[in-house]
């Protein structure tokens, strides 16, 4: 029965007034990858660190050769490290993971700078190894990938009317069913954006119900609290500088209307038309900072409590993962009903990688 057939409308729904949810539009059109199960997994590997700090209240004198540090895993035997404050360079002889210490016996002041006393919290930076001629292979540094997961969530938006509504000639050129199809498509997409931003992960085994985790819950490292007024210098220093430390140099700023107003008050030369957004049918601007570009995607979801919140998302590390992409299901009412009942149905989850490359900005009030 063609009237009861489910229609694949994933591309159509992304075109209904695209400026309502620009970030979701970009996700649906460019970052989509289907999943085969309601629970899906991915692996990610963090970059190996190369900074640590001295962790000893009294510090160390210029002859000590074993140091307790915050993170000894940045070193292996044979590595060279530097104390930036003093300029001293040392060579690692051994690493004790149980004691969180490194030993440099015989290799204090190994470069051009003499050994100097170390202070608690002095920074140490690993410069890599310096191997002798005909040396054996150095000890490997291995980082085990982390297994992450999320669930797909079923979302349904229904709409209907009586047989009389179907039969009546409308005063407007658009028939009631067509109007509802369009307006409820927008509602469905707005709800999708809220879930992808604010959702929390849950599998209710008793009721066979799942929820997908959203952006807000994934971001844990870069959370900047503006605490009120945010200047252009503060935005560049405390937002752009850390968020562009990892990942790509062009990211999407899912912005509240208030943050859009704040950015509009900054230097006009920093706001440019985003030509990359044109291919999605979007008319967006970019904020050009010394550290990277932010494509500004205003979001209607960021209102009320979230009116002063915004999210910076590195699009290369997120994916829209549908198990069942958006379909328009016509005539799902019982056969004896004098009328129609249609619905949009989507079952989708969010894949979110390298959370250090994203950021939450909150409490930016002016």
Residue ranges of each PLM-predicted region?
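Flexible, glycine/threonine- and acidic-rich loop/arm segments that mediate assembly and lattice contacts
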Residues: 1-288, 293, 298-366
